[in-house]
Structure formats: C-alpha cells, structure tokens
A protein has these predicted regions:
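S-adenosyl-L-methionine-dependent methyltransferase catalytic core, i.e., the SAM/SAH-binding region
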Residues: 1-142
Length: 142
C-alpha cells in the first residue's frame, strides 16, 4: 500500500502543476513518507520511515541473496554433530532461515534444535531494545 501512495505523492507530483519533486536527501524521503503514511500508523516508538529505509538497505546490499548463498556454504562446512545457529532480525531473513532449515531437515541431514525461534524476553528488550526483533534458530548436523 505505502509504495503506491509514496509514488503518487512524489513521482506523480502535484496534480495541478504535474511537477514531480526530486528527492535530494534522506530527509526529503522521510518528509514524503510522513505525508503519505496516515497519522494513525505513525504512532509508537518506531518511526514510520523505518521500514522504507530497511527495505532499501536490504535491496541495495542484496541481504537476502547473500543469506541464501551463505546458509548452504556454512552448513557444508559443519562437521558431524556441528551446530548451525542463525540470528535473524526481520521477517524476510527469518523466512529464508526457516525454509533452509526445513529443507535440510526434510532431507534427514539435521535435527532442528529450536522448533520455534528463540526470542528476547521482556527484560532483555528493556535492557537492549534492538533485541526486540531478533530470532534465533539452530540445527545440529546428523
């Protein structure tokens, strides 16, 4: 929903003048996002532009592609009874890890040590707010 609204707000420009505005800085992008996202979704401790910048970072750094390439390599280096433990910080990463672990489990080459991901408890999140989205998954090679 938001990408379409951001496009309409910025790329299509003002409907009366038909001028498109150039984004010259991250502050310009934040301003556009703040104008686009309804106020009721701007409440809370996480800024409404956070996910947009996260999506840009993930795409530019090819984080999901790198993770998909890394996991089989890391698993291939494990000795028998070796453990592969992965911490993910957002749902897209977690889905890649979960699916990889599921695939190798179905091949019978690992035992899953964490049926559900381990997440930070309330005390940890209070002490370390960045841990709120962390999910730990682990397998042991047969």
């Amino acid at each position: 929903i938001w990408p379409r609204k951001i496009y309409k707000t910025n790329c299509q420009g003002n409907y009366k003048t038909k001028k498109s505005k150039k984004i010259k800085s991250t502050f310009d992008l934040v301003r556009i996002i703040e104008k686009t996202v309804p106020k009721k979704f701007q409440m809370g401790s996480i800024h409404c532009a956070t996910r947009t910048f996260q999506a840009l970072r993930i795409a530019v750094n090819k984080e999901l592609d790198n993770l998909k390439e890394f996991l089989p390599q890391a698993f291939g280096m494990l000795a028998p009874k070796g453990r592969l433990v992965v911490i993910s910080f957002h749902s897209l990463e977690d889905r890649v890890v979960k699916n990889f672990f599921k695939d190798i489990f179905e091949k019978g080459v690992v035992k899953i040590l964490t049926k559900k991901p381990i997440t930070a408890d309330t005390n940890e999140v209070l002490a370390n707010p960045k841990s709120r989205s962390a999910k730990l998954r682990a397998v042991i090679k047969s």
